Amino acid sequence: MYLQGVQDEFQRQTGRRPFGVVQSAQDRDGNSYIAFALGMPAVAKISPDGKNVEAWAHEDGNGGQRPGYSGITFDPHSNKILAFGGPRPLTAFSLDKPNPRPEPVHINGDFGKLDGTEKIVTVPVNGQSVLVGARAPYAISFQSWDGWKSASIKKTKREELRNSGFTAVTDYYDGKELGLYGVSAFFDNGAHGGRADWPLFKLDSGILYF
């Protein structure tokens, strides 16, 4: 079964068709989870050998122009898949349950608007998981001490990210130093846009420490 078949199954179950694949995450068993950004909040699951693709999870959207999840990642400590954006800042799915359902994560702090969320990553920090998502011009970090029933947040901002197509955060290690870069797509400067450089923007790594 290909993704078209999964989209057909979501449509059969819900009457709505997800599209716009944005990011994938892998669990410890090698299964992949693909998030859809458009049509509806939905996640497809693909087996390690790629032979089995299933309509794994979905929920109602919030009526926005981009109702689906914008990013997805895996936290090995809680054995949960975390989706970013869409109907809420953060949504958890427990892989310890046979039929995981979307579980809203309560945010302790001011997340701000949902518009503009992009990808999210898991960064290991001092034996724990910190999630960092992109929402121009901010990088927003999350940490939880209760298995993602709730999460605290921190933000850092760079004005260069406001109009550069800020889509993702990546972590780096330089000796003992752990840091973050913002990655931009520069949508206005595509293959024929004349841009000759594609910079990374260093972010304040203080958002990794709670």
Question: Positions of the model-derived regions?
Answer:
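Active-site/pore-lining binding-face segments in mid-to-C-terminal subdomains
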Residues: D96-P98, P102-K157
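Short loop/turn segments immediately following the C-termini of beta-strands
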Residues: D29, A37-G39, H77, I81, ...
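Beta-rich, blade/repeat-based domains predominating
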Residues: G5-S32, D60-F84, D110-V130, L161-E177
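Beta-propeller fold detector
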Residues: M1-D8, V53-D60, R101-G109, S150-E160
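Structural motif
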Residues: M40-A44, P89-S94, P137-S144, G190-K202
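Surface loops at the rim/top face of extracytoplasmic beta-rich domains
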Residues: Y33-H58, G71, A83-F84, T91
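Blade-level signature of beta-propeller repeat domains, shared across WD40, Kelch, NHL, RCC1
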Residues: A168-F210
